[in-house]
């Protein structure tokens, strides 16, 4: 069983009804998100959709930003020039030994360490 961490764009795609995101999410049982993804999703939700979002997010373990994640995020941001929120998400996956599943191939190359880009839209 692969332990996964989903990037924000996969969750947004799922909530917007993108079939590839629904398929990808059903393939995995040990699913997590970074607290950064949790915050990004919360900021974008309409009040009328809050309950649905909260129920959806119960299917994920929310991983915090701790010192090892912070150190790794700074290292990734400096070496790859990706934005800090993306570096934090990637670092969270690496430090917690999870496969990062992301659609943003601009920031997360399909050949990057510990990253899977399952589809592009």
Residue ranges of model-derived segments:
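Acidic, PIN/NYN-like endoribonuclease modules and their adjacent C-terminal/linker elements
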Residues: 18, 90, 94-121
């Amino acid at each position: 069983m692969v332990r996964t961490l989903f990037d924000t764009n996969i969750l947004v795609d799922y909530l917007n009804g993108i079939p590839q995101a629904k398929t990808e999410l059903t393939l995995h049982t040990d699913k997590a998100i970074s607290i950064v993804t949790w915050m990004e999703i919360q900021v974008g939700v309409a009040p009328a959709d809050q309950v649905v979002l909260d129920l959806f997010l119960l299917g994920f373990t929310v991983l915090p930003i701790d010192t090892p994640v912070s150190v790794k995020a700074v290292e990734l941001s400096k070496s790859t020039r990706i934005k800090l929120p993306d570096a934090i998400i990637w670092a969270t996956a690496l430090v917690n030994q999870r496969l990062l599943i992301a659609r943003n191939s601009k920031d997360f190359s399909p050949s990057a360490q510990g990253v899977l880009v399952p589809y592009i839209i």
